[in-house]
Every structure is written in C-alpha cells, then in structure tokens.
C-alpha cells in the first residue's frame, strides 16, 4: 500500500521511483483517488528532478494501460500495423499523404490524431473541413475502415489513456508542459494504446517547432525512441525542419486540397515531398515492408504514380462518412474564402528568416485555429503559395496568398505575415529538410 503524498515526497527529494509506485500513482489518477493538487505537485517534482529512463518507461506504460489498449489480432490484418506522430508545426500536412502512401504499400495505419494546439495545425481539424467526415467512429467502424482502406485517421476517445487526459490538463495550467519525461509519456501513452507494431516520430526543429532549440528537439527524439522501444514498440525518430512553413499552404481546407493534389501528382511542394518520403520510407523499413530506404522510396513513388495512394485516401474519406469523389472533385467539398489576395513585402530581396510560429498564429488569428478549446474553426481561411527561405521577393513575387473572410481580417493577416518574414540582400544558407535519424542503437 502506497500513499500518493509519499510518492510525491520521494520524487521531490530526487529519489528514483519504482515501477510499483508509478503504477499506483497513475491508477489513482485514472480512478480519481489522486487529487488535482497531487497531480500538480507530482508534475512539478518531475519537472525539477526529471526521471530516469526506467521511470519514463514505467510512467508511459502505466498511462497507456490506464484505459483501453486496442488489440487488432481479431482483424487478421495481412500486414504490419504502423503509425507516425509529429510534434507539430505549420503546414505540416504529412499525415494526410503518409497514411495512404504506407497503406498502398501494404501497411495498416490506424492513426489516432489530435486537434490544433497553439500555433500548430491539427490533423483532425483538417479532416473535419471535409463535409461528413466522422472523426469519432465507434471501434468497429475504425477497424473496418482500417482494414478496407489500409488507413483510418480519427480522434482520441475517452477510453484511450484517460490518465494522460487528467495529467495533461493539470500540466497545462501549472507551467509543467515543457518537460521531456512528461512530454514523452504523454505522446507515447496515447500512441501505444493504439496497438501498434511500430512507430516513426517526426520531431520538429526550428522557429515553428514545439521544442525551443535543436538540442531540446534531439533530446526529446532520443527519449521517445528509448522509451517506446523499452515499452515494446519498435520506434525510430526523424528530426525535420520547421524553420519555414512545410507545405505551400497553412489552413485546414487549404492543406486538404494540397494533400490531395500531392497524392494525385497535380502539385508536389519539393520540401513537403522530401519530408513525406523520408518519413514513409522509415515506416516501410521499420515495419519490414522494404529492406532499405532505397527500396522503400521506389515502392512509395510507384503508389503515387499508379494512383493507389490517392485511392486509399478516397476510400478512407468515404468509409468515414465523407463524399465518395473527394479525389476527383475536392473543390466541391471544401470551403473557399471570400477574399483571396496576395501580400507583398515592403522591399525586394531574399527571404532570410521566417518566424514560423508567428505565421501559424496569423492563421489562428483569422479563425483557422482555436485560441480556447470552445472556439469554432473557419475551415476556409489561411495562407497559400507560401514563399520559401532563400527565394527572392519583389513587386511581382508575393510572400503568400491570404485567404480571408473580410478585408479587415486580410489586413491583419497581411501585417502579421510581413512582420514574420525577414527580407535581406544576401541569400541565406539552405537548411536541410531532414537533420538526422534517431534509432534505438543511438540511445
């Protein structure tokens, strides 16, 4: 028998907690026998003293096991179950292409995604811009669509990792969000409850990333890889660039359009292509669907070229209540803003730096994201035709096209975009799309 306050005291005094102590505390969180004040004190003790890797694994497993853990064995899938998770960014629409691409190569991708958080866009918000798309199907439909389309992207139900929900809500109001141990357990408890064989993490680096520095992003990637593998799920991570908007668009319906155009080959942003291919290739290799990255890229290019990846996306959308012609007639099913006008820089030159976070907040400011959880989203607004770092701007080349509801909103967004992008006379050095991979042997 343990007491919550004694477990808190031990962590406060920088002692290493046992697996049994952590299990007891998290079970209490799930059963409401541990108070909000005790959760806050525990989170702050961890914040100041951190956790060892075995403690992080125990915390992740306890939070994963606090609710339902999906078992797919009865579905008799004829391929591996694989997923990816991104720490979030702006114009980060990779999930919408990556799920169908991996599915078309023989994987099964039951992806449980989140809403937008702060300046970052949420995959669920993007999908909800498609009329009829059901992000909260019952488990039977989730399984059925995953089996038939190879991919299903849905929201987190209350019975998956419920302890995390309570812990996260408390961390959010007690200044304990930015802690590697707690972030690791929060991300992985939800992901591992989805019953995955393997996972690829996309950890963002740069001005639009969740973590403030490259070193912090790398530390998080290593923590996630070590803990997930320690918890029994084969996991690798890629550190990818978020010093500029990843896609050509930022905004919900705009990003869905771009994802569909990417899958059909109508238009592929080169940076988005590099990141999507790198993540997909890693997913195929880790799931034993390809022997190496080169073979994986050949398979992925084939399913883009022959239309199988686009077909998987269409099947998923239709299976989850959306239209059956989203690929062919996407404009009929996605909202369009009333005002679509370019914004120009005040001077000519090279795009030197971009505050990607501020660009994300410009989209939120137009109603494309939530300031508080109860806000409703305007799916049509956002940015498109985004300029990239190193490109030249002048009176003919705009920084972006702004999609707004009215003139006032357009002007506010235009001011924000201009303030977020620095123009200089010298061309900056190019940054890579993918900085490095972190595999289990690296941690």
Swiss-Prot record:
Question: PROSITE patterns under this entry?
Answer: THYMID_PHOSPHORYLASE (PS00647)
EC number(s) on file: 2.4.2.4
Gene Ontology biological process terms in this record:
pyrimidine nucleobase metabolic process; thymidine metabolic process
EC class: transferase
* One Gene Ontology term, aspect cellular component: cytosol
Q: Which Pfam families match?
A: Glycos_trans_3N, Glycos_transf_3, PYNP_C
This protein's UniProt keywords: Glycosyltransferase, Transferase
Against SMART domains, the record matches this protein to: PYNP_C
Swiss-Prot/TrEMBL catalytic activity: thymidine + phosphate = 2-deoxy-alpha-D-ribose 1-phosphate + thymine
The metabolic or biological pathway listed in the UniProt record of this protein is: Pyrimidine metabolism; dTMP biosynthesis via salvage pathway; dTMP from thymine: step 1/2
Q: Which GO terms describe its molecular function?
A: 1,4-alpha-oligoglucan phosphorylase activity; thymidine phosphorylase activity
Q: Which InterPro entries match?
A: Glycosyl_Trfase_fam3 (IPR000312), Glycosyl_Trfase_fam3_N_dom (IPR017459), Glycosyl_Trfase_fam3_N_dom_sf (IPR036320), Nuc_phospho_transferase (IPR035902), PYNP-like_C_sf (IPR036566), PYNP_C (IPR013102), Pyrmidine_PPas_bac/euk (IPR018090), Pyrmidine_PPase_CS (IPR017872)
* PANTHER family (UniProt xref): THYMIDINE PHOSPHORYLASE
Similarity section: Belongs to the thymidine/pyrimidine-nucleoside phosphorylase family.
NCBIfam families given in the database record: PRK05820.1 (NF004490), T_phosphoryl (TIGR02643), Y_phosphoryl (TIGR02644)
The role this protein plays is: The enzymes which catalyze the reversible phosphorolysis of pyrimidine nucleosides are involved in the degradation of these compounds and in their utilization as carbon and energy sources, or in the rescue of pyrimidine bases for nucleotide synthesis.
Which proteins does it associate with, and in what oligomeric form?
A: Homodimer.
Protein name as it appears in the record: Thymidine phosphorylase
Originating species: Aliivibrio salmonicida (strain LFI1238) (Vibrio salmonicida (strain LFI1238))
């Amino acid at each position: 028998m343990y007491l919550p306050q004694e477990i808190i005291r031990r962590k406060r005094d920088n002692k290493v907690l046992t697996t049994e102590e952590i299990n007891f505390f998290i079970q209490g969180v799930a059963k409401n026998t541990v108070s909000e004040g005790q959760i806050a004190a525990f989170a702050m003790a961890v914040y100041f003293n951190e956790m060892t890797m075995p403690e992080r694994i125990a915390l992740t497993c306890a939070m994963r096991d606090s609710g339902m853990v999906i078992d797919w064995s009865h579905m008799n899938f004829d391929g591996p179950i694989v997923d990816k998770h991104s720490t979030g960014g702006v114009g980060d629409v990779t999930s919408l292409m990556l799920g169908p691409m991996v599915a078309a190569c023989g994987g099964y991708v039951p992806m449980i995604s989140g809403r937008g958080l702060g300046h970052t866009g949420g995959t669920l918000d993007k999908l909800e811009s498609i009329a009829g798309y059901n992000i909260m199907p019952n488990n039977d439909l989730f399984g059925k669509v995953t089996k038939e389309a190879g991919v299903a992207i849905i929201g987190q139900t209350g019975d998956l990792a419920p302890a995390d929900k309570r812990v996260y809500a408390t961390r959010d109001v007690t200044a304990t969000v930015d802690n590697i141990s707690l972030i690791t357990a929060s991300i992985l408890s939800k992901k591992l409850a989805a019953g995955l064989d393997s996972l690829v993490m996309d950890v963002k680096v740069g001005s639009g990333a969740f973590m403030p520095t490259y070193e912090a992003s790398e530390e998080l990637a290593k923590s996630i890889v070590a803990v997930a593998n320690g918890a029994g799920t084969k996991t690798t991570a890629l550190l990818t660039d978020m010093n500029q908007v990843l896609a050509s668009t930022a905004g919900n319906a705009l990003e869905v359009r771009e994802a569909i155009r990417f899958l059909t080959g109508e238009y592929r942003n080169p940076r988005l292509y590099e990141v999507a291919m790198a993540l997909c290739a890693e997913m195929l290799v880790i799931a034993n669907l390809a022997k190496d990255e080169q073979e994986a890229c050949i398979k992925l290019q084939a399913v883009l070229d022959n239309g199988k990846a686009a077909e998987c996306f269409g099947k998923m959308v239709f299976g989850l209540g959306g239209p059956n012609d989203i690929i062919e007639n996407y404009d009929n099913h996605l909202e369009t803003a009333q005002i679509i006008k370019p914004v120009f820089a005040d001077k000519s030159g090279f795009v030197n730096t971009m505050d990607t976070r501020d660009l994300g907040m410009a989209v939120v400011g137009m109603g494309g994201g939530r300031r508080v959880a109860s806000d409703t989203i305007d799916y049509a607004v956002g940015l498109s035709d985004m300029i990239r770092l190193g490109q030249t701007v002048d009176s003919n080349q705009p920084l972006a096209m702004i999609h707004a509801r009215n003139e006032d909103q357009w002007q506010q967004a235009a001011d924000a975009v201009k303030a977020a992008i620095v123009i200089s006379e010298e061309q900056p050095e190019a940054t890579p799309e993918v900085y490095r991979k972190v595999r289990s042997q690296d941690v």
